[in-house]
Amino acid sequence: MTEINIEFPDGSVKPFEQGVSILDIAKSISTSLAKKAVAGKINGALVRLDQAINENVKIEIVTKDSEDGNIVNWNSAALVLTSAIESIYPGVHFGEIGNGEHGFYVDTDKVDQQISVDQLPAIEDKMKDIIKSKISLKHSEISVEEALASVDGDPYQAKIVKRNEKNGKVSVYDVDGKIIVSDNVALLSTSDMKAVKLLSVAGAYWEGKSSNPMLQRIYGTSFYKQKDLEAELERQKEAHERDHRVIGNNLDLFFVDPKVGAGLPYWMPNGATIRRSIERYIIDKEVKHGYQHVYTPVLMNLDAYKTSGHWQHYREDMFPPMDMGDGEMLELRPMNCPSHIQVYKHHIRSYRELPIRIAELGMMHRYEKSGALSGLQRVREMTLNDGHTFVAPDQIQAEFKKVLQLMVEVYRDFNITDYTFRLSYRDPANTEKYFDDDEMWNKSQSMLKAAMDDLGLDYVEAEGEAAFYGPKLDVQTKTALGNEETLSTIQLDFMLPKQFDLHYVGADGEEHRPVMIHRGLVSTMERFTAYLIEMYKGAFPTWLAPKQVTIIPVKDDLHGAYADKLREEMVDKDIRVEVDHRNEKMGYKIREAQTQKIPYILVVGDNELENNSVSVRHYGEDDSKNEASADFINNIVREIESYSREND
């Protein structure tokens, strides 16, 4: 039989007979590896263990203890779930099945009624029965005609057949007699599946379009070991407690009502106060660092986005243009860059003015599908803390360092400590997809690297991750829920200044092309607020808290006037304070203030009235201490002004 060469991750190459499977290769290495193996990768693509190999390739063995191993488990559990549902509710229709960051999901459409969360235990028990039976998850590729016949009567599966067709074939699984269309990679059988849990039911539009039917999406998770499932359930419990949507509702920060517009949050007074505090902080900080704040329209002529390239590259993320009837087409802006370019172009610029730093809390709109929307994290209307600096080429490195130092300063004030830097370069093996200027790329990438080294900052380098118009620095962070996201970005742009024909007059009296630096310190107000809600678990530091102090009179008729006097003194110092005059028991008022996570609870009674003092209780503490009212006010003012990051 013909031999083929198999390359392993360490670079070694071994010959095998043509037609060898991933499992065969694992067995040839060691019995223990074969027992741990659940899938493989061929030239980076995930494949089943029984995948035959007929040519020279590079492979990896995917084991149970890897991220890809979890994905294979989740794909398998999703298939088992379809079989379990079918056995309990014959005739049910199936939409998408897939995996997410922490588990799997299956979309269903039960014709006579919806599947509710109360029905999950019975479905889960059936899944466990199927898993214990150690059935095979039989995979095959069949013709489109066979696939359509297998899913006859299920309109969603029929559409998936047509969508997944490749060269006249469709990938399907037979799970205990139930045929399901899926390209996902699954286990050979259920024998390695040890722990499964169904978690919730939610609505999901078919294909993510609000004009399509609403299906029931069943979420679950599964693992190879029970202890891993228990750890995940504990993580999810913590995630729920930190979920900004849950906290946002409990603390009355914001709400989203699909009836008046999905992805369009309403900021309630508490949430608006937090946002306003962030915005004031950002503006003051940027002004101190030489930025000129502007206001620019949320509507712009479509031609500007054609010039910038947004229309060509990001049209699917933009709302449809508005035809004004006179040939003018207006567009809700998805980016602020063209607006700030117009500010720059409004005057003739001299080299003496550079760098010119323009900033704005700019409202933008993105065409997000309903299924992608989530609280404040994914919205259709957002306000970006955006900044654009126009520099001469020899100013790039110095300005890049200044922006980076500003970012680090902001992170410190918000107590953000868990972040990493990623320098993104163009792919040297595929330069065609980038702005065509080799000298520019080489020089600018070297400048950014030198700036990071000068500042003594650790970073990773990522080839192929640059924007098409220039290299960039991404600041990556882990949210309180363990998800990685980009907190801030600095991007060099050599293309837009050319597209919009930007100039400055140099010392030689000639026109020169500036370089544009895009930067966002803290992303959008919506996403950053969500990040902070989850990071602080709703217990904001005093300077950000919507209500910083609540004053509770022991007896309102005797101590209410003193409480009001204290309130007036604090309001004069810009402290956010309220007096609880309600006819409720003091213990109830204290518990409610703690539930609202107000940093300071002040109780005033006879002793406090007589001594002009307050009884102070910090959030999260059971004990109180007596303090002169003037001292308390002075201390909290200092705390607020210094962006104190602890409520103590």
Swiss-Prot record:
One of its GO terms (cellular component) is cytoplasm. The keyword Electron transport does not apply. Residues 243-541 are annotated as: Catalytic. InterPro entries: aa-tRNA-synt_IIb (IPR002314), aa-tRNA-synth_II (IPR006195), aa-tRNA-synth_II/BPL/LPL (IPR045864), Anticodon-bd (IPR004154), Anticodon-bd_dom_sf (IPR036621), Beta-grasp_dom_sf (IPR012675), TGS (IPR004095), TGS-like (IPR012676). NCBIfam families: thrS. HAMAP family: Thr_tRNA_synth (MF_00184). This is Threonine--tRNA ligase. It comes from Pediococcus pentosaceus (strain ATCC 25745 / CCUG 21536 / LMG 10740 / 183-1w).
